[in-house]
Amino acid sequence: MGIKFTKMHGLGNDFIVLDGVNQSIQLTVKQIQKLANRHTGIGFDQCLLIESSQTEGIDFNYRIFNADGQEVGQCGNGARCIALFARYYGLTAKNKLTVATKTTLMDLIINEDNSVSVNMGVPRLAPGEIPLLADRQSPEYSLELNNGNTVNLHAISIGNPHAVLLVENIDTAPVNSLGQQISFHPQFPEQVNVGFMQIVNHEKINLRVYERGCGETIACGSGAVAAAAIARLFYNLSDKITVHLPGGDLCIQWPCPTAPIILTGPAAFVYEGTLLS
């Protein structure tokens, strides 16, 4: 008997979601890589697995696997999908859930319009928490590239590592070439997601993201949060920022640097299926 799955997406950032509460699921790295292939598999940016939690106060364990099979600690778009998945399939009747990932806890609230608000926690800037190999914390870091040039960027953790670069025009930004170099740079020992941010006005930014283990995706929830946090901290943007990604818009609210940052956006069901092998 095969494993049932549901295809979902958040602004085009697409997933297969697996119910590990009612099914026993043990996928290998190679199996995930095969399933992620858009020509010979299902095709997705991440594989999401929801499991029962034995910890008081935590409703579910939320596990995230990139297309390369690597388990990671954060995915904001996936979190919104997990919330709707859990309620739709009767795993919970609650509209507010707490889930645990590999690295963090997340509070998820299903709103009346079926959008989901995600408490992404308090962003962290200390190099050791990102992680980034640097002598001290700084607003901006300089990385030497393969060709001998340097690039200046911000670095932040939203439960997973992010680099954010300010650009004049995201349409012409070298997202794949430069994004890959930065993502695999040895100063980021766990690799890094790379956001290319264009400030539109006091309340809006445009963003493209190169995700570690995936390449460029048309939406990245944690990347949107990382960019909005950097914009608020270092470029004096509003406490409520609209992040425009190729897949659509996300709303980020951050009242102050010591408060949790909140991501709100949609999630959608696409189809159900069964993994046969």
Curated annotation (Swiss-Prot):
Q: Which UniProt keywords apply?
A: Amino-acid biosynthesis, Cytoplasm, Isomerase, Lysine biosynthesis
Q: In which pathway does it act?
A: Amino-acid biosynthesis; L-lysine biosynthesis via DAP pathway; DL-2,6-diaminopimelate from LL-2,6-diaminopimelate: step 1/1
Q: Which Gene3D superfamilies match?
A: Diaminopimelate Epimerase, Chain A, domain 1
Q: What class of enzyme is it?
A: isomerase
Q: Which GO terms describe its cellular component?
A: cytosol
Instruction: Name the positions where substrate binds.
Output: 13, 46, 66, 76-77, 160, 193, 211-212, 221-222
Please provide, alphabetically and separated by semicolons, the GO molecular function terms listed in this UniProt record: diaminopimelate epimerase activity
Catalytic activity entry: (2S,6S)-2,6-diaminopimelate = meso-2,6-diaminopimelate
Which residues are marked as site: Important for dimerization? 271
Transmembrane parts of this sequence: none
**Record bears the keyword Cytoplasm:** yes
Family membership, please give it: Belongs to the diaminopimelate epimerase family.
Assembly with partners or alone? Homodimer.
Q: Which HAMAP family match?
A: DAP_epimerase
Its biological function?
Catalyzes the stereoinversion of LL-2,6-diaminopimelate (L,L-DAP) to meso-diaminopimelate (meso-DAP), a precursor of L-lysine and an essential component of the bacterial peptidoglycan.
Task: Kindly provide the name given to this protein in its UniProt entry.
Answer: Diaminopimelate epimerase
The gene name on file is dapF
